[in-house]
């Protein structure tokens, strides 16, 4: 009988190794791992052809109609483990508006009625070279109401894979634990007791750590029938939740996470609104009127990040004031570790990113007022602040040295935002002047690391204001639109510029029709979370409708046109264990690669 020990031990070792390899090459969550680094240790394929195309959002034409032709929906990243793919699919009902855009006047249609849609998590599997449906799980999750706070930008629905299960967001702050193989419910986890409150929402993607714990944000909002949940009432509750592998859950309130933040009815610094006082700041000593902060809560699409040492990172903001924002660190038992304010960190405003007008030309376009203090944000007359907006999907990224990146929004650099870097102890280190709706990808190499982020320059708006009658708000030209690789100090190493100028669409017969020179300065990069493979190859989407693979040195490796040049909320992509690329365009899942190696 003792002779059986060696085969049994060998079998255990082999099973353990196979499990570790499956996990190493999986894409189980936002940003691939709990640090959200966007890196996977496989060699990505060259996207030479489409291998699959599946519609997951049938409401795209209606969504575009209500958004003036754009697609303002944040979608889940395709989750992958082995030969299985897990993706959101939308069903239910889209309520059309009597007149396109009338939801903006409060009509119960379009984004104001997106709770009539149904969200499903569907398992797909590769069989005989085709990606086919395996099972479907219909959840009761709904997004936060649009109200006057989300402006038609649909929040993200985002499960996570962990230890053989799919954790799927549910209603009332709950999570469904679903068997990964067959879609059967294993348990329904409710951290808030037996009640399921329809005005309590799982907010943002779920994050799974290496120990099988799952983390997510929850917020409770006012019933829209009582008051607008964003500006008519303070947030009623906000929590970070941790679910252990045994389904036990624990919560901590955001009020406890940011004890030094302004209170719900305290005043927070405002911005200048009166366009008759342009150029801003109105005077060297002007101070904008304050307004109520609101209680602290997470940003709508924020996923917690988990460092290898167990530290948890999330983003908090005032309910009424996105500038009253913090990077928050927690211990693994959900006790507060530290909080770092994002306010008044930047000195790159007037005189740097924005010229200060000369006395001889006080109305110089896109300039600060004569005599302005160098470095200030002209909209506040104070050092610039990173803000946490509910319209983006930026999420903390933990770097190899333990420091943390966050993408934030700033208005005064033509809405490009800033990528901010903090130390593991909460000290502010530096910034790069783009960060809007971005979770950057990280590539370790040569004893250091590099960071990849989109770097769009937006046109059609002024640098810091929107009055078309004022020279201070002269619209900027579009572009350039770059993918930029930064070093560890957030200094550019290379930039890859989008040079596509024509708008194309794929016809039903597979042919492609293009209209030339619609975008003479190129297209935006339509990416909120890039992918980097083991060779340093970067994979990104563009609003020109193509998937791009960029070499490690920033040159083009290959690009593949998918379906349609489209203006859209930025989308993520992922890689499978065999290097296939899973990307998105026009509400459709595309798989690209070199062939059908099954």
Q: Where would I find each of the regions flagged by the language model?
A:
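Bacterial N-terminal signal peptides
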Residues: 7-14
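Small-residue packing motifs within transmembrane alpha-helices
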Residues: 6-7, 307
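Noncatalytic, solvent-exposed loop/strand surfaces
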Residues: 19-597
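Positively charged n-region of N-terminal signal peptides that target proteins for export
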Residues: 1-4
């Amino acid at each position: 009988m003792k002779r059986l020990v060696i085969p049994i031990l060998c079998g255990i070792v082999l099973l353990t190794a196979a499990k570790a390899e499956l996990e190493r090459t999986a894409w189980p969550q936002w940003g691939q791992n709990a640090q959200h680094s966007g890196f996977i240790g496989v060699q990505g394929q060259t996207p030479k052809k489409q291998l699959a195309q599946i519609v997951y959002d049938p409401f795209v034409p209606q969504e575009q109609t209500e958004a003036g032709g754009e697609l303002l929906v944040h979608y889940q990243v395709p989750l992958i483990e082995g030969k299985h793919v897990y993706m959101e699919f939308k069903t239910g009902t889209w309520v059309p508006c009597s007149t396109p855009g009338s939801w903006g006047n409060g009509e119960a249609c379009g984004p104001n009625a997106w709770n009539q849609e149904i969200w499903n998590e569907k398992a797909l599997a590769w069989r005989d070279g085709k990606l086919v449906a395996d099972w479907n799980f219909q959840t009761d999750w709904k997004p936060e109401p649009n109200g006057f706070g989300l402006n038609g930008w649909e929040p993200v629905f985002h499960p996570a894979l962990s230890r053989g299960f799919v954790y799927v967001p549910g209603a009332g702050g709950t999570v469904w634990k679903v068997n990964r193989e067959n879609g059967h419910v294993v348990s329904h986890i409710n951290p808030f007791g037996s009640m399921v409150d329809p005005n309590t929402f799982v907010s943002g993607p779920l994050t799974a750590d290496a120990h099988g714990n799952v983390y997510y944000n929850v917020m409770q909002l006012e019933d829209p029938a009582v008051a607008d949940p964003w500006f008519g009432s303070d947030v009623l509750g906000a929590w970070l939740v941790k679910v252990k592998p045994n389904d036990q859950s624990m919560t901590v309130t955001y009020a406890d996470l940011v004890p030094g933040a302004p209170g719900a009815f305290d005043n927070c610094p405002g911005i200048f609104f009166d366009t008759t006082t342009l150029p801003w700041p109105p005077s060297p000593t002007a101070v904008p009127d304050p307004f109520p902060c609101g209680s602290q809560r997470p940003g709508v699409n924020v996923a917690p990040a988990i460092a290898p040492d167990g530290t948890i990172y999330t983003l908090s903001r005032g309910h009424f004031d996105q500038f009253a924002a913090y990077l928050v660190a927690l211990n693994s038992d959900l006790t507060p570790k530290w909080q770092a304010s994002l306010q008044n960190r930047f000195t790159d405003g007037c005189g740097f990113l924005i010229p200060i007008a000369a006395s001889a030309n006080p109305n110089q376009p896109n300039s600060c007022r004569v005599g302005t203090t160098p470095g200030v944000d002209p909209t506040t007359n104070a050092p610039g602040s990173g803000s946490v907006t509910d319209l983006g999907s930026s999420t903390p990224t933990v770097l190899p040295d333990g420091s943390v990146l966050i993408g934030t929004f700033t208005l005064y650099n033509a809405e490009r935002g800033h990528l901010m870097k903090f130390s593991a102890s909460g000290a502010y280190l530096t910034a790069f002047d783009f960060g809007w709706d971005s979770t950057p990808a990280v590539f370790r190499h040569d004893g250091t690391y590099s960071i990849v982020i989109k770097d769009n320059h937006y046109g059609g708006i002024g640098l810091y204001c929107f009055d078309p009658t004022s020279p201070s708000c002269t619209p900027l030209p579009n572009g350039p639109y770059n993918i930029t690789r930064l070093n560890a100090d957030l200094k550019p190493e290379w930039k890859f510029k989008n040079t596509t100028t024509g708008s194309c669409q794929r016809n039903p017969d597979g042919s492609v029709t293009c209209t030339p020179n619609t975008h003479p300065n190129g297209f935006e990069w339509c990416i909120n979370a890039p992918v980097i493979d083991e060779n340093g190859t970067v994979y990104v989407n563009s609003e020109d409708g193509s998937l791009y693979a960029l070499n490690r040195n920033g040159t083009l490796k290959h690009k593949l046109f998918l379906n349609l040049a489209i203006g859209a909320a930025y989308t993520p992509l992922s890689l499978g264990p065999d290097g296939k690329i899973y990307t998105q365009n026009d509400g459709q899942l595309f798989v690209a690669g070199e062939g059908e190696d099954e």
